[in-house]
Amino acid sequence: MIYENLLRPLLFRLDPETAHELSLSALRLAAKLGPANPLKQSLPTSPRTVMGLEFPNPIGLAAGLDKNGDCIDGLAALGFGFLEIGTVTPRPQPGNPRPRLFRVPEAGALVNRMGFNNSGVAHLIARVRQTRYRGILGINIGKNLTTPVERALDDYREGLKAVYPYAHYVTLNVSSPNTPGLRSLQFGALLDELLDGLMGEREELTAQHGKRVPLALKVAPDMDSREIKALAGAVVRHGVDAVIATNTTASRDGVEGLEHADEAGGLSGKPLFLRSTEVVARLADALQGRAPIIACGGVFSGADAVAKFEAGASLVQVYTGFIYRGPALLAEIGRVVAAL
């Protein structure tokens, strides 16, 4: 409640990206206090086994909040059952020009066109090697803007090789709306080529490192039933270990006429909830248990998390809900999940 009633009003007076950077800095500083960290909280244990990994609870941080792995220890102290960092690209890139992150508070939403701004995979690995965190860490990888879609496999392969020794699972981000052409990798021959190449690469990395790291595919909410079935078929055919549903949406349903709603970029938060949950349900129907689903999109309460599980998800991730509600959201979901 301290966050929602005191800190959030102060942060929301700032530019969204400045507030984001300040929040991460505060979490980093708090983590250095160890047991005296005033933000530290423990959630009830609600173990889940997904992708062959043991999760202490099913509540994760979605990729995008800590793109560079700069705040792993600070975020871990909040009670997450797992963290996903990134999206990271092989080479550093600045992303799109500012402003590129916008709040739509009347709708509990954000619009972002960040454009995979990150410090590159070498920086992220250095941060991961420094962390004290020993929980489940996912690393989300993407392609550089300057790499054409036809050569996307090169970037994903390079990213996978680099992060493989340090990740509990690796997410292939093929669904951001802010990198031109990226979403085409979700379909047809481009998806088959990408997955075929990366599954072959994983076989070699498994032999090299003596461990098999699961691969998850993060997908968009803006797919029709035919596209969802085709994607599910590719997931099963290539042996993808999980699907993360979903990324942000290009739709503006539910935010029409609101300030910043028409900004270019992906929409996240409450307006995404129904659309993303429907994708979870359709994927669950198409997959028939052959790959687990990690739900992401519009989770603002314990009831929202339960709805994702009922739709067929095994785990949930939060981002925009966490921006609006802070650590109290995790505590609420933890209580509700423990009571199931």
Swiss-Prot record:
Q: What does this protein do?
A: Catalyzes the conversion of dihydroorotate to orotate with quinone as electron acceptor.
What is the native source organism of this protein?
Methylococcus capsulatus (strain ATCC 33009 / NCIMB 11132 / Bath)
Q: Which GO terms describe its molecular function?
A: dihydroorotate dehydrogenase (quinone) activity
Enumerate the catalysed reactions: (S)-dihydroorotate + a quinone = orotate + a quinol
Q: What EC number is given for this enzyme?
A: 1.3.5.2
Summarize subunit and interaction data from the UniProt record for this chain.
Monomer.
**Where, by residue number, does substrate bind?**
67, 112-116, 173, 178, 247-248
Which Gene Ontology BP annotations are present? 'de novo' pyrimidine nucleobase biosynthetic process; 'de novo' UMP biosynthetic process
The entry sums up its family as follows: Belongs to the dihydroorotate dehydrogenase family. Type 2 subfamily.
Name listed for the protein in its UniProt record: Dihydroorotate dehydrogenase (quinone)
